[in-house]
Regions:
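Sec-dependent N-terminal signal peptides
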Residues: 3-12
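Structured C-terminal helix/loop/strand segments within mature extracytoplasmic catalytic/sensor domains
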Residues: 42, 99-105, 148, 153-231
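Mid-domain, small-residue-enriched loop/turn segments at the edges of structured enzyme/sensor domains
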Residues: 77, 81-82, 96-149
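Sec/Tat-exported extracytoplasmic proteins
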Residues: 56-66, 86-90, 97-105, 109-119, ...
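Short, well-structured active-site flanking segments
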Residues: 53, 62-79, 158-164
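A short, well-structured edge-of-sheet supersecondary motif
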Residues: 15-41, 193-197, 203-204
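Second-shell loop/turn segments in exported
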Residues: 40-48, 72-84, 91-100, 129-137, ...
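Active-site SXXK
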Residues: 46-69, 85, 145, 202
């Protein structure tokens, strides 16, 4: 992924558009990637994927037939379907799915997804079943998170199969004014919003915790000049 840094940051931090501690990547449908905020050295620092890992759990569950209908109520989600469980980042349904899939199977999907940095230990989930929702001890980087979002946008393998296509529909934020597919994550000192919509893929990373989630969402949806939708 070739990164173009905005020399004068005319679209970024010098005008106060983005927080000083934000890292923001944006890639056009033509494949041009801009670093709108932050330093390039931040892109490859290992970080916890937080709840962005739930996309891997959802993909594996769809591919294995554990979830057949993304609009049907999902066990453990108190009546919500897979789409809303992803959007609200509910924990219980993904805990159940992770246990049903098992560490070896889920680790295989994690490796194929491109999200996780380094080799995935065979017993990565052993004794950490309730931490699988955020990848347990597995690590990602801002660059990898964004590359996955770009792969979603471009329909590149492994996301071009039936399960990958269903996942893309499950990631749709139906309340948004434009067709945006995204996933949030907040854990381990990272706040993520990553996904894609018309003409671009965007990844927003902020340091911190849950209180900064609304801020990250505002930046993300602001790249399409629309408000943050309600679930």
């Amino acid at each position: 992924m070739r990164i173009l840094v905005l020399a004068f940051l005319w679209a970024g931090t010098c005008l106060g558009q983005f927080p000083e501690d934000a890292v923001i990547l944006e890639t056009s449908e033509k494949g041009e990637t801009l670093l709108l905020a932050g330093k390039e050295r931040e892109l490859d620092v290992p970080r916890e994927p937080a709840s962005t890992f739930k996309t891997v759990i959802a993909w594996a569950a769809l591919d294995r037939g554990l979830v057949k209908d993304i609009e049907a109520p999902l066990p453990g989600a108190e009546g919500d379907n897979l789409r809303l469980a992803l959007q609200k980042s509910l924990n219980p349904p993904f805990d159940l799915l992770a246990v049903e899939l098992g560490g070896e199977v889920l680790g295989g999907y994690a490796g194929r997804s491109g999200l996780i940095q380094g080799e995935i230990p065979k017993r990565w989930m052993e004794g950490k079943e309730k931490e699988a929702r955020h990848g347990a001890d597995l690590m990602t980087t801002i660059r990898r998170e964004h590359q996955v979002a770009v792969a979603w946008m471009m329909g590149r393998p492994p996301w071009d199969g039936p399960a990958g296509q269903k996942l893309q529909e499950a990631l749709l934020w139906k309340g948004a004014e434009k067709p945006i597919r995204a996933k949030t994550g907040t854990y381990g000192g990272s706040v993520w919003v990553t996904g894609y919509g018309p003409e671009k893929a965007v990844t927003v990373w902020l340091p911190g915790g849950l209180p900064r989630r609304p801020e990250a969402l505002k930046i993300f949806f602001g790249r399409w000049e629309i408000p943050v939708p309600n679930p």
